[in-house]
């Protein structure tokens, strides 16, 4: 028998088995964010609000997205299903038009059915609406993404509106910032990262609650995967400014919950959808494209506040975590035929009590933009990362906003002119990749020495390939037989050879 949360709680309260106040959950999401915060030891940037949240959180050092692309990542974290299973193979908007399958049971859908009030403020970027319904929604679908995703005063007021109209039900609020995403391709008047939007300068408008912070390009910390050039440093400095705006927005959102008297009843999670938009970052399944910040703050689990977890966790774990927080079971259902859907992620709540031994995470990417078909699958087991490039005969595709970025244009110009690039790779090896890439990050943290053909690692390679294939079968991956076979479920074996010399 199903029982809505408030009704069940009323009954259990009489029996002394239910909390007098409902639990709530707040998910804060950065857009193309990385480790630009004091909480993750970046001393060049000021992020006091994220740092304060980290002191009340368990900080995960080995958290990864399962896909390094905006819509697929958001769909995956809101369903607990990898992109190849939920159907969001690429970007949702405009000509790309990817959508999750109609029968997918998303987190907001399951929460709503269980009596939890749901809200979203900011960048949604997933569909269809029937799969991702929210009771309260202010997104790019009914307003300006700049206003609901970057104007932190507007975001603050929308959070207040959500809380003021709150009824007796517990709530799940999803605040999806548009910072620090690039905007030089779409709104160049606001700067490469929209760092000028709302800064009070002529024609830029003014965000009342934002105190802009400017950074000297000479002072930024250049990650190993970003060219150490003036163009890239200027890009990073602009990115820092928008990270600062988001950080102040995080502080405003948390203050609204505090003022409403619900912060101490609310599970707060902060993370990002994918890696930063720089070479080897977003759209890649390397470490820079998949490693994410992850802060989990539970008012009921202060034991590990301020601690660091080394456990390997995935954004696929967020749906089971939030369902666990609300004590809502995951249903048994099928999307196609009789294949029952099972979550491969796990609840992170046990990690808030004691350090777990979790050591494996998986990745799956098929598209970004509709023209960027470059399916990749990956598994990371402790410090070993295996990447399978299914279209390895083709050059790796570059997305539009990254292509026109100052960093990449400078890299192209330096490469064609034969000048030093200040980069740890070269474009030829970036474009053309081996089918299998195996890296030992304990000895090769920059992932430059491919061990896949080294006979000393043959047994490890086989083990990781088996792990990856097992996960692909469990998650009903249509690409499981590619590139040298075709999936035919009515035959045995189901992977039939193509004899294509691969």
UniProtKB/Swiss-Prot annotation:
Keywords: Calcium, Disease variant, Disulfide bond, Glycoprotein, Hydrolase, Lysosome, Metal-binding, Mucopolysaccharidosis, Signal
Main enzyme class: hydrolase
Positions bearing 3-oxoalanine (Cys): 70
Glycosylation site list: 41, 142, 151, 264, 413
Impact upon substituting residue 128 to L: In MPS3A; intermediate
Name assigned to this protein: N-sulphoglucosamine sulphohydrolase
Effect of substituting residue 235 to N: In MPS3A; does not yield active enzyme; the reduction in 62 kDa precursor and 56 kDa mature forms suggests an increased degradation of the mutant enzyme
Family listed: Belongs to the sulfatase family.
């Amino acid at each position: 028998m199903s029982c809505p949360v408030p009704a069940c709680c009323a009954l259990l309260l009489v029996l002394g088995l239910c909390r007098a106040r409902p639990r709530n959950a707040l998910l804060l999401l950065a857009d193309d964010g990385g480790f630009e915060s004091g909480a993750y030891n970046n001393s060049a940037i000021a992020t006091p609000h994220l740092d304060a949240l980290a002191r009340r959180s368990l900080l995960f050092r080995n958290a990864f997205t399962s896909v390094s692309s905006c819509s697929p990542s958001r769909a995956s974290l809101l369903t607990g299903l990898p992109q190849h299973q939920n159907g969001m193979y690429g970007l949702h908007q405009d000509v790309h038009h990817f959508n999750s399958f109609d029968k997918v049971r998303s987190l907001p859908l399951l929460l709503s059915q269980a009596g939890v009030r749901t809200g979203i403020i900011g960048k949604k970027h997933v569909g269809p609406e029937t799969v991702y319904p929210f009771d309260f929604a202010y997104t790019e679908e009914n307003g300006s993404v700049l206003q609901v995703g970057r104007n932190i005063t507007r975001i603050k007021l929308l959070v207040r509106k959500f809380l003021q109209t709150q009824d007796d039900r517990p709530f799940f609020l999803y605040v999806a910032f548009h910072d620090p995403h690039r905007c030089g391709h779409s709104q160049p008047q606001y700067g490469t990262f929209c760092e000028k939007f709302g800064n009070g300068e002529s024609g830029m408008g003014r965000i009342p609650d934002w105190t802009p912070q400017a950074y000297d390009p000479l002072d930024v910390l250049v990650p190993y995967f970003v060219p150490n050039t003036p163009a890239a440093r200027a890009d990073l400095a602009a990115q820092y400014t928008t990270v600062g705006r988001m950080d102040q927005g995080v502080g405003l959102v948390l203050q609204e919950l505090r003022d409403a008297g619900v912060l101490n009843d609310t599970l707060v999670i902060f993370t990002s959808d994918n890696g930063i938009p720089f070479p080897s970052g977003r759209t890649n399944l390397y470490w820079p494209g998949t490693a994410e910040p992850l802060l989990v703050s539970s008012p009921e689990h202060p034991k590990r506040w301020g601690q660091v977890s080394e456990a390997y966790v995935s954004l696929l774990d967020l749906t089971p975590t939030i369902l666990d927080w609300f004590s809502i079971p995951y249903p048994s259902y099928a999307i196609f035929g009789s294949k029952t859907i099972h979550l491969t992620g796990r609840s992170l709540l046990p990690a808030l009590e004691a350090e777990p031994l979790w050591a494996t995470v998986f990745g799956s990417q098929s598209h970004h933009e509709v023209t960027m078909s470059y399916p990749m699958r990956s598994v990371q087991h402790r410090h070993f990362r295996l990447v399978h490039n299914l279209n390895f005969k083709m050059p790796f595709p570059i997305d539009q906003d990254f292509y026109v970025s100052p960093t990449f244009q400078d890299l192209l110009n330096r490469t064609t002119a034969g000048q030093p690039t200040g980069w740890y790779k070269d474009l030829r090896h970036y474009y053309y990749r081996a089918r299998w890439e195996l890296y030992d990050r304990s000895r090769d943290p920059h992932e430059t020495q491919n061990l896949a053909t080294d006979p000393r690692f043959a047994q490890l390679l086989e083990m990781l390939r088996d792990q990856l294939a097992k996960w692909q079968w469990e998650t009903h991956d249509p690409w499981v037989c590619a590139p040298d076979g075709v999936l035919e479920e009515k035959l045995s074996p189901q992977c039939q050879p193509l004899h294509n010399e691969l």
